[in-house]
């Protein structure tokens, strides 16, 4: 998926839809195109897991917003493809347009949907760590890498995310009293659970 240069006098504007989330188009490009499930499967997953929050008028997270936008873009692309299929007389031209939409735009939408669903499901840091791990794995010559690629769903159990900066102080464990959450905390947790 290449970066998009915008028309209408905005040439040279560098848009990367993953930048604000700490990733890049290049980082996602390490994953092969057949890695991403079909748009239909991704839409079914998004609907099954996040339907209520996606349909809500509340702002839940930037990932929910991006997911909504990707879904709306796909709906518009399918509307265009249907229109082209019904109105373009030349079958060869019609097939070229429909195939281009399905192949190129379909891959971009599949990447966007996968990224945001995965961030909502596993957490952004875990997904970024996975992308880096996979990128390192795929660029390592086969003779020097493990036979199996990293798996996102097992990543939190098998890797240690190292953060930059000082290492945290070590403290000896001390017994602590368990405190009940304050009403404010309880309210914020219930709101987060909706999203």
UniProtKB/Swiss-Prot annotation:
**Where is the region RNA binding?**
189-195
GO terms for molecular function, please?
DNA binding; RNA binding; structural molecule activity
Origin: domain of life: Viruses
Hey, what's the signal peptide range on this chain? none
Motif (Bipartite nuclear localization signal) on chain: 170-187
List every stretch annotated Disordered: 148-195
> According to its record, what are the GO cellular component terms?
host cell; host cell cytoplasm; T=4 icosahedral viral capsid
Q: How is it modified after translation?
A: Phosphorylated by host SRPK1, SRPK2, and maybe protein kinase C or GAPDH. Phosphorylation is critical for pregenomic RNA packaging. Protein kinase C phosphorylation is stimulated by HBx protein and may play a role in transport of the viral genome to the nucleus at the late step during the viral replication cycle.
Whom does it interact with, and what assembly results?
A: Homodimerizes, then multimerizes. Interacts with cytosol exposed regions of viral L glycoprotein present in the reticulum-to-Golgi compartment. Interacts with human FLNB. Phosphorylated form interacts with host importin alpha; this interaction depends on the exposure of the NLS, which itself depends upon genome maturation and/or phosphorylation of the capsid protein. Interacts with host NUP153.
Q: Which family does it belong to?
A: Belongs to the orthohepadnavirus core antigen family.
Name of this chain's protein: Capsid protein
- Record the organism: Hepatitis B virus genotype G subtype adw2 (isolate United States/sf/1990)
Q: What is the lineage of its organism?
A: Viruses, Riboviria, Pararnavirae, Artverviricota, Revtraviricetes
